[in-house]
A protein has these predicted regions:
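Short helix-capping/hinge SLiMs at alpha-helix to coil transitions
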Residues: 21-27
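A short alpha-helical element within helix-turn-helix/winged-helix DNA-binding domains
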Residues: 29-39
Length: 206
């Protein structure tokens, strides 16, 4: 049996390294102009061709319609021998609810124990003290895995029309059947409704 070896050119690797360094230093991917300047090329098409190959081979993903919507995937990090990065996505409340913030503030390297799920994680900075008995304090960075599967007792990232919050998900066989529980007796439970959506499960505090 022949094992197919993954091939990446020097130029493609250089593009990945530039994107990685820019994520670390600036907190977002480089623009087309910045990439062309770093690579010393003038043609947009040349860069698009490189992106197409990298995307086809699952080294990166691209967000349609976004000039900076480039994400390095697990294979891409491996190709440049770099630690995977996770986005830090603003603030969310460990109190009541705060307005959802989707902007990425920065990118942070992941430890080896979570590298295998690098494509499906995000880091959230929390506000408030409703989770202090779970050792989550104001300003802490929490690593969440993006998922749709939860069990009672999970600490979750929950979204509603009012905003987002971090709480413990509780599901039981008596009323109230499902709710979000703070880990601070000064705060009330939040009853689960059809308008709520849990989008992440806590992996650990960073």
């Amino acid at each position: 049996m022949t094992i197919k070896k993954e091939i990446i050119t020097k130029r493609q690797r250089e593009v990945l390294e530039i994107i990685y360094d820019h994520l670390i230093t600036a907190g977002f991917p480089p623009s087309f102009s910045e990439l062309k300047e770093k690579l010393n090329i003038s043609s947009n098409q040349s860069l698009l061709d490189i992106f197409s190959i990298l995307e086809k081979n699952n080294f990166i993903s691209r967000e349609e319609g976004s000039a900076r919507g480039i994400k390095i995937l697990k294979k891409g990090y491996k190709a440049i021998s770099a630690r995977p990065l996770a986005p830090v996505v603003g603030f969310t409340s460990a109190g009541g609810f705060t307005e959802a913030i989707e902007e990425i503030d920065a990118w942070q390297p992941l430890s080896k124990d979570v590298e295998t799920i690098a494509d499906d994680v995000m880091i959230v900075r929390v506000m408030g003290n409703s989770m202090i008995n779970a050792n989550i304090e104001d300003g802490d960075l929490i690593l969440f895995k993006k998922t749709k599967e939860f069990i009672s007792g999970d600490i979750v990232l929950a979204q509603t029309p009012e905003g987002t919050t971090v709480k413990r998900f509780i599901s039981q066989n008596k009323s109230p059947y499902q709710f979000l529980k703070p880990e601070n007796p000064k705060y009330p439970i939040i009853l689960f409704t059809d308008e709520m959506e849990m989008t992440g499960k806590m992996i650990k505090k960073l």
